[in-house]
Amino acid sequence: GTLRELWAVKPDGQGDVTDTHVVWRSKTHIGRYASPLLVDGLLYVTADENYFTCFEPATGQVVWTDRVPGRAAASPVYADGRIYLCNQQGATTVFKPGRTFEVLATNTLACGFMASPAVSGKSFFLRTRTHLYRVESLPSGQGTTASRKDP
C-alpha cells in the first residue's frame, strides 16, 4: 500500500526543511484524496477506510477518531457552523465541529460522491457520479429546496 502521512511544517523555512521545520507527522487514518479541514483551531481529516479524525494542529495529538458511513474521497467542507462529509456511496454526514465526535444528520442521494461539495451563500452544489444537485436553505422554518441537473 501507499504510505500516507499528514505533516505539519513551519512555513518560514527555505530549502530542505525536513530536519528543521517539521513539527509533527501522523499516519493515523490519513486518506489519499481528501484535503484536511481547519475549523476553530481543530484539524479534521478523513481517510478512505471510513474514518474521520480530529487533530490538535499545534501538536498532532488525536482529539478523537471515529468510523463514518461509506468511503470518502471528497474533502470535508465547513458551512453554517457544521462540517459536511460526502462519501462514495452517496451519503452526506453532517457533524458538529468540536472536541467530541457528534453526528447531527445523514442525508443520502442515489449516486456516490468523488467531488467535494461547493458552497455559495445558502446553497450547496453537490456533484455525484451522474448528476449535479443544488440544495438551498430556505428562510427559517421553511426547510430546504433542491434542484437536479441531468447530464
Question: Where would I find each of the regions flagged by the language model?
Answer:
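Noncatalytic, solvent-exposed loop/strand surfaces
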Residues: G1-P151
